[in-house]
């Protein structure tokens, strides 16, 4: 039986504390939790892969959200062998962010697609955070990781899409990316080609956007020194926002 903690300082000491042996999901809650089933399914798959014990029951999560009256907030669920930790935070992205768009920077760190950890939301997130924070200090909103073969993988906190000649492309999961929930929504609702992409594809793209569960869909206005138009991305984002109302 896991210890349940909500916005508390106390947890049981286990491999999650000593070795970052744990997984997490970050869920957007508006009037209701967005993509809750998809998040819990992915969480339980991660629990199996990491050998962390029993699954999380989606009804338990629904009841927790209802009991705590959570709305218009971000819920993070962390699972270790002995703990389930809930925490909440405000939704940090503003209308101004979506109006202005984001700027991307290439990271010098390479993703390893042969590592299973690449495909999980595991607690060992230091590399992502270090590169993300470094880019922020340099005036960028997100970084782009290539993998060891030179293909585009993902951002520190996001999946990446490019648009060329009105066609949408995104890296294959096998290039070393987290199979994002919003990424999957885009693939299901638009004609998207999953293929190997490299940094030259970013330079030659007409438009670029990134996705994650809290951000939703964010247009990219600049990669390094390359600027982009955003008209098609704006339409995709509009459809997504209508979907999650």
Q: Model-flagged regions — what are they?
A:
Residues 1-67, 80-245:
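Helix-start/capping segments and mature chain N-termini
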Residues 70-76:
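Short secondary-structure capping/junction motifs at helix and strand boundaries
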């Amino acid at each position: 039986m896991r210890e349940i903690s909500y916005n508390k300082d106390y947890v049981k000491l286990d491999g999650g504390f000593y070795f970052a042996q744990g997984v997490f999901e970050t869920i957007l809650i508006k009037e209701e939790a967005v993509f809750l089933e998809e998040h819990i399914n992915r969480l339980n798959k991660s629990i199996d892969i990491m050998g962390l014990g029993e699954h999380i029951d989606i009804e338990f999560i629904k009841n927790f959200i209802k009991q705590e009256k959570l709305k218009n907030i971000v819920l993070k669920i962390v699972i270790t062998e002995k703990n389930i930790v809930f925490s909440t935070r405000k939704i940090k992205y503003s209308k101004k962010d979506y109006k202005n768009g984001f700027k991307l920077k290439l990271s010098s760190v390479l993703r390893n697609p042969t590592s299973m950890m690449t495909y999980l939301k595991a607690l060992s997130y230091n590399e992502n955070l270090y590169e993300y924070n470094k880019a922020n200090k340099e005036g960028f909103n997100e970084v782009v990781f290539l993998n060891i073969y030179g293909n585009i993988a993902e951002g520190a906190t996001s999946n990446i899409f490019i648009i060329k000649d009105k066609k949408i492309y995104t890296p294959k999961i096998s290039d070393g990316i987290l199979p994002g929930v919003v990424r999957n929504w885009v693939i299901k609702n638009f004609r998207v080609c999953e293929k190997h992409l490299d940094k030259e594809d970013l330079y030659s793209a007409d438009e670029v956007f990134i996705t994650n569960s809290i951000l939703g869909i964010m247009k990219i206005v600049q990669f390094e020194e390359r600027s982009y138009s955003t008209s098609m991305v704006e339409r995709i984002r509009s459809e997504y926002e209508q979907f999650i109302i």
